[in-house]
Amino acid sequence: MVLPTCPMAEFALPRHSAVMERLRRRIELCRRHHSTCEARYEAVSPERLELERQHTFALHQRCIQAKAKRAGKHRQPPAATAPAPAAPAPRLDAADGPEHGRPATHLHDTVKRNLDSATSPQNGDQQNGYGDLFPGHKKTRREAPLGVAISSNGLPPASPLGQSDKPSGADALQSSGKHSLGLDSLNKKRLADSSLHLNGGSNPSESFPLSLNKELKQEPVEDLPCMITGTVGSISQSNLMPDLNLNEQEWKELIEELNRSVPDEDMKDLFNEDFEEKKDPESSGSATQTPLAQDINIKTEFSPAAFEQEQLGSPQVRAGSAGQTFLGPSSAPVSTDSPSLGGSQTLFHTSGQPRADNPSPNLMPASAQAQNAQRALAGVVLPSQGPGGASELSSAHQLQQIAAKQKREQMLQNPQQATPAPAPGQMSTWQQTGPSHSSLDVPYPMEKPASPSSYKQDFTNSKLLMMPSVNKSSPRPGGPYLQPSHVNLLSHQPPSNLNQNSANNQGSVLDYGNTKPLSHYKADCGQGSPGSGQSKPALMAYLPQQLSHISHEQNSLFLMKPKPGNMPFRSLVPPGQEQNPSSVPVQAQATSVGTQPPAVSVASSHNSSPYLSSQQQAAVMKQHQLLLDQQKQREQQQKHLQQQQFLQRQQHLLAEQEKQQFQRHLTRPPPQYQDPTQGSFPQQVGQFTGSSAAVPGMNTLGPSNSSCPRVFPQAGNLMPMGPGHASVSSLPTNSGQQDRGVAQFPGSQNMPQSSLYGMASGITQIVAQPPPQATNGHAHIPRQTNVGQNTSVSAAYGQNSLGSSGLSQQHNKGTLNPGLTKPPVPRVSPAMGGQNSSWQHQGMPNLSGQTPGNSNVSPFTAASSFHMQQQAHLKMSSPQFSQAVPNRPMAPMSSAAAVGSLLPPVSAQQRTSAPAPAPPPTAPQQGLPGLSPAGPELGAFSQSPASQMGGRAGLHCTQAYPVRTAGQELPFAYSGQPGGSGLSSVAGHTDLIDSLLKNRTSEEWMSDLDDLLGSQ
């Protein structure tokens, strides 16, 4: 022992030392590599830092240059742009006049000289990098100074409208060097800059967002909203001002120009209202206390909310969020809203309020309109409100509150609106909620542009409803936020309710749907109950599919197209509900529909007191919903009745067929009875019957009935084609075996099966009849029948399940028919080639149906039913298959069934690939070209299912299995139940299966099962 140990140790030591040496060398290499990399990094770092500095400087220069150019353009061209807005033109001219034009021009020239001197060398670097892109955008935006450049908002129409509506403010600001003021005022006085942005919407947004973007990019620490907030805040003053290279005097001059161009009161009103309201949601309105506080708070708040939104690149957010306060939000809602309204008097608050005011004048009395007009003037005033102190905020708010109160009282006299507007705190809180929901509403604003006309009508009313309340306290954040959302809801609901209830419904709908309900609605989109009380049924049905933003569109669809829109969605909902109780869900929905109006009230209460307070709106919505619900219920009931009738017929047929099958089994000669294919197949049929029963249940689910009928006719087509194909595809061997097995089958089993399958698809019965026509032909026909039946059943099921997915629908459209019609027969017949013919007769028909599925989803349909069959059948009837067919192929089937879950993806691939292989064979056999050597292919098939990638047959099989998986997935579509319930249905039909199995001794069954399992 010692001797060997020593040598072992000796050998071990060298080995150990060698390993250690290698490790040491490797470590040394790593160290060298690390040191080399570090050295290179250090060597390159200075260059990298220099490049960063250059880029930063270039960006800075670009920002300054762009700012100066904007200031120059807005100061010089404003005369041209100002004329468009009649009111602003004089002010613009005055602002640009000797008083302001000279200082502005001087500042512009000075800044530009500095920029040119500093930037001209930098331009190359900038062009190479950020600067080039930025200058291009800024240049383009600058070229569209008025609103066309709405820049970040991308809502040029809004800003031009806003400018035209409140051009005096917007254009005046722009003309007064809006852009220069934009950054300058943003830096020194966010209020002024924000007012510019609010007013100009586009240009201020350009100058502010672009310059800020540049600025922010200059300062990577805070590139994003954080930077915006910080930069926009006091930091922005210190950072942006130095970056702009403008001294205090220049800043003062620029701000003075702004103040001169825009009345102080207007500036005060604008900033007080806009920013204050922004703060109300965000900073609790603390900003309005002092001009400086306002400047700082508004800066931080204004730039953070609005600018963040812009930089976030979420025009939706801008539109939806209180953040609209700035450019992005205000112009986004304004562009969507103001275009529809024809004037977003002030892109920001004015856009929200004046639009509300503008729409409201329709409903509001002259006094309210007068106040609205004041607000419209405030459009100018609001733009220029910024400079004003807190004292004017109170006056502006008072005016807003008065207008809002009058609007609320006069427009709808809805407590709802009065409730939100009366409490600025509430509005601020609600606005806060709004901003939080604004992200949710963002999609809505996006949709809002989709239906501007409806917005215009509805939006006007909605603003009347929504904005009046919003107007009062912090109308701008909440108002714009609600407005976009409300516009969506309004545009959707008004179409349904039109403007009849638009005043009531829109307000309530807007408050209800756009506020928390929408957010809740999105969160609960599946449930859709909290926020979908209005169109809850339709939305509930629809939301699972389309969710929040679509929910608005669907609201429009539901409201506008209650029957078509709601019905389909309702039908969708019932299918989901139908999964459990097919007919009950409709009633449940009907109940829910009936309850939905209460839901609306509840939701309204849940959402906001204003919405609850508008009982009229709730009542109108309830009535409308009730009508829609009733229609939907009727349609659903009809569908359910049809489905139930169809199911009853199928069940009746199945029962009769089962009886016939049992009788035939009993009456058949012992040899045939003992014949494994025949014996197993009838059992399979029985099992399939259970499966078909399950499938009928699936058919009962939702639209599957309609799709099933389609499938059946298709099956009928398949059947007729099947016979032809059967004759063509029938192989001599198949004909012999098929004659033996199938003929018996057709006589006793195929016809019953056909009837069974026919129960699933009335066609199979017909096919069952044709089978007698020719041994081979009907053998094939039974197969086809099975295929058609399985296909039909599967198709029905698949359409049920897949119908929702649209694949089965495509099949329903006819792809299923051609695929199933041609391939299934050939596939079936080839599969029929052996005793497998019986097995394939059932299994392959499914496969054939599934294989056609290769061309289309039909395999899913067939497979889905087949999968259910196979899981249930293969376990139960697979032994039968094993008897009827070599256990090995059958086992593959069952194994495929087991593997099915794995195969489905493969099957999808194979599905695509299989069709290609299939076509090469004769058309009849295309489906089963590989399968046509049913026995051999089946062997391969049995293997291929296991391999998932087996031969063509395997592919078909996999397809079939994926179909089963599809069945499992299909339940997801309509019958989340079908896959499970289908299997359960099969299990539920275990009695039937057992009764079929009873024909055989338990020992035989167990042996078959063992064989099947063993083969697996």
From Swiss-Prot:
Widely expressed with highest levels in heart, pancreas, peripheral blood leukocytes and spleen. GO terms for molecular function: peptide antigen binding; protein kinase binding; transcription coactivator activity. Residues 413-426, 801-810 have a biased composition (Low complexity). Residues 116-129, 283-292, 322-353, 392-403, 427-439, 451-463, 577-595, 602-617, 834-885 have a biased composition (Polar residues). Signal peptide: none annotated. Residues 67-76 have a biased composition (Basic residues). The modification N6-acetyllysine is found at residue 822. The keyword DNA damage does not apply. It is found in: Nucleus speckle. InterPro entries: MAML1-3, MAML1_3_TAD1, MAML1_3_TAD2, MAML_N_sf, Mastermind-like_N. It comes from the Eukaryota. Its main location: nucleus. Residues 93-115, 263-282 have a biased composition (Basic and acidic residues). Keywords: Acetylation, Activator, Notch signaling pathway, Nucleus, Phosphoprotein, Transcription, Transcription regulation. Residues 65-184, 263-487, 561-617, 658-681, 796-953 are annotated as: Disordered. GO terms for biological process: atrioventricular node cell development; atrioventricular node development; myoblast differentiation; Notch signaling pathway; positive regulation of myotube differentiation; positive regulation of transcription by RNA polymerase II; positive regulation of transcription of Notch receptor target; protein phosphorylation. Belongs to the mastermind family. The C-terminal region is required for transcriptional activation. Interacts (via N-terminus) with NOTCH1, NOTCH2, NOTCH3 and NOTCH4 (via ankyrin repeat region). Interacts (via N-terminus) with p53 (via DNA-binding region). Forms a DNA-binding complex with Notch proteins and RBPSUH/RBP-J kappa/CBF1. Also binds CREBBP/CBP and CDK8. Forms a complex with PRAG1, NOTCH1 and MAML1, in a MAML1-dependent manner. This is Mastermind-like protein 1. It comes from Homo sapiens (Human). The lineage of its organism: Eukaryota, Metazoa, Chordata, Craniata, Vertebrata.
